Amino acid sequence: ISGDFAAIFDPNTLNQDLAIYNELPFTVLFVDGNHENFTLLNSYPVSMWNGGKVHIIKDNIIHLMRGQVYSIEGKTIFTFGGAVSVDQYRRIENVSWWKEEMPSEEELNEAKENLLKYNNQVDYIITHTCDAITIRNYLAYFRGKVSEIFMDNEMLDYFETNVKYKHWYFGHYHFDGKITDNKTEVYNSFYELR
């Protein structure tokens, strides 16, 4: 899941919100989006899993943390969740909006260090939002309007210009569509990583 997992949001309904995922016959992996309860999400202990840091929510529900590279079924997957909420003005801090939605410089630096261990080459990149280059060059054609560019998008430009990858998946813009030969916006669809 490429962000806005949102099942870890209300502590009072947490078990109910996770129930649908508990019943699935596979492990659910997700990067955080901007609509997450980061206080609750970050209350889970940090563990190492397949080469990178994670929050294990349940045995079959795992949060892939920002700036990590995982080896899964012979593939390398780099993750970097988070995004800016364009509707912050109508949300309440630490109730319906958390400042941790925006990736930090520390997370970016950790990402750069981890990617260097793989010579800046991975099979897949999974983020919540996308880089500013993609917004400027492609997203307007799919959404019928130009999306605003925020600091998080510019932060992700580093990965576009410095990392070799086969495919990049992101989910912030709430539609399904192949943007380029190697970039896909994911909303309700499933894609097999081959």
Protein language model features and the residues they cover:
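Active-site-proximal loop/helix segment associated with metal-binding centers of metalloenzymes
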Residues: 52, 59, 73-151
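Binuclear metal-dependent phosphoesterase catalytic core
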Residues: 69-73, 144-147, 157-162, 173-194
